[in-house]
Amino acid sequence: MTASPLVTADQGAVAAPDQAFFDSLNAEVNDKGFLVTSTEELFQWARTGSLWWMTFGLACCAVEMIHVNMPRYDMERFGVAPRASPRQSDVMIVAGTLCNKMAPALRKVYDQMSDPKYVISMGSCANGGGYYHYSYSVVRGCDRIVPVDIYVPGCPPTAEALLYGVMQLQRKIRRAGTLER
């Protein structure tokens, strides 16, 4: 009978795990074709490959958002698919000028999304007000209403820029797991 690596011989006290034991066990299992990981890492991997996004197209940036779904860019090859309901989506792309009257609707839609939820701010108007920055009716950046994870600059940003922003979000999720707010 072999002793467990977590229990010491004296008084049966629990000690720190023996790293060499786990390394040898991991090497033995890997040789047989198995994958050893934690459930959190598995969920994190699945989350990066199945981002469902919801459009919040407010102005001309929404046209560029449509382009990434066409065959030339085909955002679905990265596991990103559009959804019409906020309850089914975990990424919201805010594209265009956000007015004061639209801000409560943006917050309401954001609150209806399931956790974990991410926001991509697309274009100069969504990032900071854009050309309409000094207007009385414009919110100077959607980050004043909802927390933003990725900013895509440009007026309007190209479809390649949005695609790059989605890939940056996937890297951010892979690197940090769920993003705590």
Curated annotation (Swiss-Prot):
Summarize where [4Fe-4S] cluster binds, as residue positions. 60-61, 125, 155
Respond yes or no to whether keyword Transcription regulation is given for this record. no
HAMAP family assigned: NDH1_NuoB
Q: What is its EC number?
A: 7.1.1.-
Cofactor dependence is on:
[4Fe-4S] cluster
Keyword list (alphabetical) reads: 4Fe-4S, Cell inner membrane, Cell membrane, Iron, Iron-sulfur, Membrane, Metal-binding, NAD, Quinone, Translocase, Transport, Ubiquinone
| Catalytic reaction annotation | a quinone + NADH + 5 H(+)(in) = a quinol + NAD(+) + 4 H(+)(out)
Q: Where in the cell is it found?
A: Cell inner membrane
GO biological process terms held by the UniProt record: aerobic respiration; electron transport coupled proton transport
Q: Which of the seven top EC classes does this enzyme belong to?
A: translocase
Per its record, how is this protein called by name?
NADH-quinone oxidoreductase subunit B
Q: Which NCBIfam families match?
A: nuoB_fam, PRK06411.1
User: What would you give as a GO molecular function for this chain, any one?
Assistant: NADH dehydrogenase (ubiquinone) activity
Q: According to its record, how does it sit in the membrane?
A: Peripheral membrane protein
Pfam families listed in its UniProt record: Oxidored_q6 (PF01058)
Q: What role does it play?
A: NDH-1 shuttles electrons from NADH, via FMN and iron-sulfur (Fe-S) centers, to quinones in the respiratory chain. Couples the redox reaction to proton translocation (for every two electrons transferred, four hydrogen ions are translocated across the cytoplasmic membrane), and thus conserves the redox energy in a proton gradient.
Q: Which GO terms describe its cellular component?
A: plasma membrane; respiratory chain complex I
Per its UniProt entry, which superkingdom is the organism in? Bacteria
